[in-house]
Regions:
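Unchanged
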Residues: 35-58, 66-124, 148-149
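A short linear hydrophobic-aromatic micro-motif
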Residues: 17, 60-63
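Conserved hydrophobic "DFG−1" position in protein kinase catalytic cores
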Residues: 9-10, 17, 79, 111
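Charged phosphate-binding loop/patch that engages nucleotide di/tri-phosphates or the phosphate backbone
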Residues: 123-149
């Protein structure tokens, strides 16, 4: 089963997202990526925060798991920025790496006001966007479980 680690980084009533433009589609995703062999989901989340956002983070808590069909599980962590500069990602999608293809689209790190999350139908996973809205109002509870087909 493929495991993906994602982060929820909130500052000043805004959440960090990656704005994507790919194959004529415009959408937003929570930062994250695949867990490499020998790596824990927590380690992957920390690595992905640096690669995609340019920030160092500390894990606060696991907030959600999303089962995607039979082949993938996404784990999301609430994180706190401890260093780095937002928008200075070092991942291959931001550099002239030979292994990155422009066909993979454009990645732009952004801060989206949390009150705007509810008005965007193109934030993925939508369950995590709804969880952020609810949890900012009511507080973070135990791990939420979601399933996507």
């Amino acid at each position: 089963m493929r495991i993906r680690a994602g982060i929820v980084l909130i500052q000043n009533k805004k959440v960090a997202l990656i704005e994507r433009h790919r194959a004529g589609l415009d959408y937003f995703v929570f930062p994250g990526g695949g867990v490499d062999e020998g790596e824990t989901p927590e380690q992957a989340a920390i690595r992905e925060a640096m690669e995609e956002l340019g920030v160092e983070v500390a894990i606060q808590q696991k907030v959600a798991e999303v089962k995607v069909g039979l082949k993938s599980r996404h784990i999301y962590f609430l994180v706190e920025q401890t260093g780095g500069e937002f928008g200075t990602g070092i991942g291959e999608e931001y550099t002239d790496s030979d292994s990155y293809s422009p066909d993979e689209g454009i990645y732009i790190p952004i801060w989206m006001p949390i009150e705007e999350l509810a008005h965007h139908q193109n934030v993925y996973p939508a369950d995590i966007a709804r969880l952020v809205i609810k949890s900012v109002r009511e507080g973070w509870m135990e791990v939420s479980l979601f399933e996507e087909l």
